[in-house]
Structures are given as C-alpha cells and as structure tokens.
C-alpha cells in the first residue's frame, strides 16, 4: 500500500512523556460516509497509536465500537468503514479513536435510524448470477432547502414546468445489460387532473421515456435503461417537465438518483459497492489479496473482511465493498479530543453559563463580569469542548446532553446564553462556518414546515425529544437566551448596549407600555387592546392603531422607538424582516434607528420575525439586536407561522409573569410564563415551541 502515502497535512501535537514515550491520547477522525477509509499509521503514532498495540484501542461511531484493520505493507495503514449516514447536522462522520481503558460504551440509541442503506431494486435476482454482480451507486447533492417538504428537507434539483435539468452520470465500466435508475423525489404540487405530474428522461440523446405519477408527496420511480444507451465514463442524463392538460403547474424536487448496473467480477473500479449472490470463489479466483480487498457490509456498523470462497446460496444476496490499493479514501481531519476546561474548576453555585466558540466568548467578557458583580456566579464553555464529550459531532443534541449534566452538577444553574448564529444548513452544504457557530433544534410545524426551536435546551429532564409532542405543558428548567452572532464585532457592539442599559444610561426611565397593531385586520387591534387592558392600573399604556392605507407609518413607528417605553409589543402580520403586509416597519429601518432615549424589550405577536436561521435574509430581530445606536435590548419573537388566537395564550402568560416579578430578570419571566400555557392543540404547541428569547436571559427588567 505504499501508493497510499501522503495523506493529509494534519497538525501533529507534542505528546511526549518525560521518558520519551508517547502518551496515548483520544483522537477525533472526520471522514466521508459510505467509503472505506485508510489512515497512515505515521499520522496516528504521535497520539500514541502503535501497530503492535491495536488491540488496546477502540474505534467508535456515536458510542458504537467499529471494527478496524491494520493493513501492513511498506507503509501500514489503519483501515475502517465509514457507513452512509443521514443527518441535517453533518456531511461527514466523526469517529473517536481512544485507548481501550478510556472507552466507555454508550451507543447512541438513535444511530440505527441515522444509518442509510438503499433498498434492493425490483427483481434484483434477475440481474445476478455466478460471476455477475449488481454495482450500486448513489448520486445526490444537497443544494436546495425546502422547509415544507415531509421528512427530508434538502434536495438536489428543482423540476418544474418547461425547464430542463442536465446531470452527468459516471459509469465506471460498460454495463452487461440494462441499467436501473431509481428516482427519489418529492412533489410539492397537485391538480384535479390524473395524472398531474410527468417527467421526460433522456439518456445520451439515445433513450427517451416519459414517466407519470399523481399527487403530492414522496415518489420512488424505477426506470430501466437499455445497456446500449449507456457507455463507460460520462453519460448525460436530461430531465424535462412537459406540460400536462388540465395541470397549471408542476413542481417537484429531486432528492437523489440510485443507480444499479450489472458487471462482471472482479470489479475494475478502485472502490465500488455491489450486490452479489452465491459463491464468489470462481468469479474472484486468483485475485491478488495483497492489493485488493473485499468486505461484506450488510451490517454497516460491523463490516466483515471476507474471502470469496464463503459458501452462499445464489438466492442469498449480500452487499459487498471492493477496494483496490489506490481506492481507499482519506480522512479529512484528525485532531485530539478536547477536554472540558471547567469540569472541576467551579463551585455548585454557578447560576449562569455562556456557551459559544472561543472567538465569540472573548468579547462577551465585560458582560460576564457585570453579571458576576451582580451576584450571579458565571462560567463559560467553548462549544467544541462539548461536542468532543458527546460523540464529536457538531449537533444540538450534544449541547442538550451537556446542559442536563450541568444542571445536575450545578443546582443553582438558571440562565444559559447561547452565543452564536446558525442556519437551516448546519451541515454547511451551501453556507459557511461563520453562519453556523452554534446549532439549534429543528421541528416541523403546521403552517411553516421545518423551523428552529430552543425549547429542548430548556427542558432537560426528558430522555428524548418525544416530549415535544406529548407533554400537556412545558416546564423548563433553564432560561435559554439566543444571541445569533456570526462575528465578534456583533457580540462586542451588543455587549456595549447591554452595559449601557444595565448601568442606567439606556434603561427606560418610565414604565410605559406601547402596543402597535397592523391595520390590515381588526383582530390585531382587538388583541393589542386586550394586551394593554392587562396592564391597566399598574403602568401607563399607549397604543398606535393606524388605519389601513395610511402613509408614513414607518416614520411613525421609528418615532415611537425614540420615546421611552419599557416594552413595545406588535400585533399583526409579519415576515422574516418586517411588520405588516404593507411593510410598516422593516429590518432596514431597524438598522437605521439612532439616538434613542432608551432600549426597550420588543415583543412580536406575529410570524417569522425571529427566523434568524435564514442564511441570506437578516431578520427584524437581528436588525434590532445588532444596531449599535438603537433598536432593542431583548426580543421575544417567533421562528414560525402561527395564528393570532394561539399566540394570545403566550402574551397573556407573559404579562402575568412579568407583573408577578417586576424586579426580576427577563429569563425569570420566560421560565414562569411557559408552564401557564396549556398545550391544548397543535397551534398553541407550535407557538410555545417556536417563540424564542433573544438576548441575555439574565437581563434585569426595566
């Protein structure tokens, strides 16, 4: 395997003991899925891994031990199989390699659902015989996000009326007979006509076929392509959506194409997976096992290196992976696991934790010092340290597991500030790492499809996330605040605002409450009036209820921010970056606010204004937070579409909680409000799940 040398340019740590020997250290390995990986031992030796000691080490995937081999040649390599996994949080698998004495078996019960294995094609036995295998491959790219699809939300290509999509299909060897293509797609439209969808498939301009189906939802459609229409190498696959009589629009999203084609054994490709039945001895007789390897991968977590002479019935179909010397894939990253720096360094009095990347936590320091001086015992933790304690993946579930542990370790823990932006693309298919600093949870809602929720971080006494759909009320243990920052500058400017507020410079001097109603519907004015009625006799109240069609509403609302209100509450239609169908106040206008007397708390009883997970659109919430000269100090806003009647349960609970602790903190209001809301229907549940507290949960109330 000398030709496998080179590997990747990994940073090599200095782990030498005083006696000159290498101290074993736990290692995190990132690798592409659905591939056999080889790592030169010289890249692992600095961490203490030696060929002679391989039995003293454990390789694991999400707590599940994974078999590995040391293939010893001129340059020995550690070899293991990286199975196909599917998660919205990652593109690559993360394996932990650690001394056996350090390994704690804790397999993730959800791992079996993360492993993906393509279904056998129709009539698979018709394609197999002694010496003939069915090569399998999957073509997909996650390029298009669709919140409203069911289950899977990432797609490769959009298929719509009179538009053409061209895909290059690479076939390693000329197929012996027909090639089977399985199209997996999601249809987003439907029509009374039957069928209401058609797709014209052309291969190399020599094969044309139209396929039809009916209705919305997922489709798996298999198409057989004659062998003479396919060539070894690049093939052009053209997809076109013709018009259909009685169908105004057709819209589908292609998720993947699974390819199956018969090939004579042994395979010619450097690394290829295939289906085969029967005894492979005759077909593979005489192959040089020192340069080619064969694994059975029916059990993706426990592949077996096999020899072709194993007796199997021709009807006993197995999955294999064939690898030549040059076919092994490389690991993309090898790095030591980080330990929790604050594991034993703080007392049980900790009441406030800030979590984020080191880069974003640094400018947060003045705020943490203020909270410490105000009587809260504070600590911080870098998010990478958390990931490395829980399987190594950058996922929200790791943060939740840590918070559950922290709550047991620190009984006084009450406030958690999550410092970092994220998007609906945490795996970074189409976005950057800067946009995905700290992940969140995703749920499916009634009207808006998939969106974010922070509730699982707050409720940590439940073993899994089933409680999101089953509990009659939510009783959070922790007040979670999200600061969706993507840069240190944003954190720094926001901290300066909070300091000015807490020191009294920008804290509202009056107790006035302002309610703004969208003029488009009478129900919004009704709700805003009812909201203000709850404050009567306790504080001064004001309303701004313009008439539909009025001009200059944006200037009117900007003027309201210049006044001294402790709370500004909006009731009405909304979108990610604005209030009102008529755009009565937008994110751009929020960015331009300047010279405010004070910074209010802003409550949004609308839709989507807290949808901070969009990678391209700045939400109204973010615009109000990041404005260094104005805007809001804390915001409660939704990441979803919900109904005004369902939102009313939230604003009633918030007012009651606020009034019961006027000298408390915004996080205290949030914690006491949620249990007051009976989750009587899915709409109310969506409201509670998707409304988010933005800013510091320990902010003192104005």
Task: Locate each region found by the language model.
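Bacterial N-terminal signal peptides
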Residues: 1-5
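Cysteine-dependent hydrolase recognition
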Residues: 9-702
